[in-house]
């Protein structure tokens, strides 16, 4: 894929490293991978919080505290069908509830834009959109940008170019800007080994490989989006 879960997980880890109390929410409600990327057991999920109508403050101990004491994880529902019970009104409630206990919220969204995502986009302060120089990824990113433009959400979008230095891409960074008609605010280098190892360990590379260029790139991104944010982007399935 384009790497949005990797970016979301490490962006949240970077906020926490900076000293901000951060909640990473897996909003890929049916097939989210945040729990795997952070090596947490989804004992308390988005579904549990919303369907049990929990007041967050006295139940903060249910959240999973990660490696950094400032980073908390709210995984996607355990069963894909549980996502069907979550509606747009609940999205607003979720953000309002979480905002009372955290400095920063980072939502990892699914590849497909649905009504719940659109509600989340409208309520967010920033939308971090991840893409690569893969032509199929750029085509799908353009489609998503067009949707958000019609909803007058373009001003919230921050475009990130992942794996920008991968030798397999023939498109250069300037071409991306021309194709999508939007500035790229940050680039992230291509390092399969670091990313793969960090996922297998369940520890964001911000912590497991803190001195790698890819970790520095995420920290630079964090300095540009120091607000609640949604991380989205179209994944491209390789055949």
In which residue ranges do the predicted regions lie?
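G-domain G4 guanine-recognition motif of GTPases
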Residues: 132, 157-169, 187-193
